[in-house]
Amino acid sequence: MIIGLTGKNAAGKGELANYLKNKGFIYFSLSDALRDEATKQDLDHSRDNLIKLGTEMRVKFGKGILAVRINEKISELSGKDIVVDSIRHPGEIEELKKNDGFILIGVHTDAKIRFERLVKRGRVGDTQTFEEFLEHEKKENAHEGAGQQLDKCIEMADTTINSNGTVEEANKDLDSYRNSLEN
């Protein structure tokens, strides 16, 4: 089974990915692929830089380039359970769908809760104020072409998990969905 996770910043994708890793899933993140490329180019890992770099890579190499790089790794892991985090463009989804058994899960969490999580997380490159957070939301959702299109990705999801509550509640919803696929 290959599970892809998409959702807005601090929605809880990483928590669900960690839960699946603890259940034996092999983990890949498209954001890590971006961070690796930023390091190669000696760029700061700020959110703005990563968004810009992702757009540049999609223009230069194709809209699914980050997923193409992950698919190369997935192809070596036939039959393994895999989770792919940080899917932010429909082209990436199309590439990942080339894998048998790919399922896309959208993770939804209200903006205020996501901002509170982001502040608590304290990751380098994250925004500092709620207004900055909302401005970044616009950047992540208003693009056409090679830019991030999170709303479109969420619309393409096979199911959506609401992550407004506790991590345990979201994990339970994920397990329920996975069990429904096996029956």
Q: Model-derived features: where do they sit?
A:
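P-loop (Walker A) phosphate-binding loop of NTP-binding proteins
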Residues: K8, L20
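ATP-binding Walker
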Residues: A11
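Walker A/P-loop
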Residues: G14
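ATP-dependent small-molecule kinase phosphotransfer cores
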Residues: I26-V83, I87-E94, G125-D126, E131-L134
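Short, well-ordered beta-strand core segments
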Residues: Y27, L104, T159-N162
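Small-molecule kinase domains that catalyze NTP-dependent phosphoryl transfer to phosphate-bearing small molecules
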Residues: G64, K120-D173, Y177-S180
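Conserved phosphate-donor/acceptor-positioning beta-strand/loop module used by diverse small-molecule
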Residues: D85-S86, L96-V124
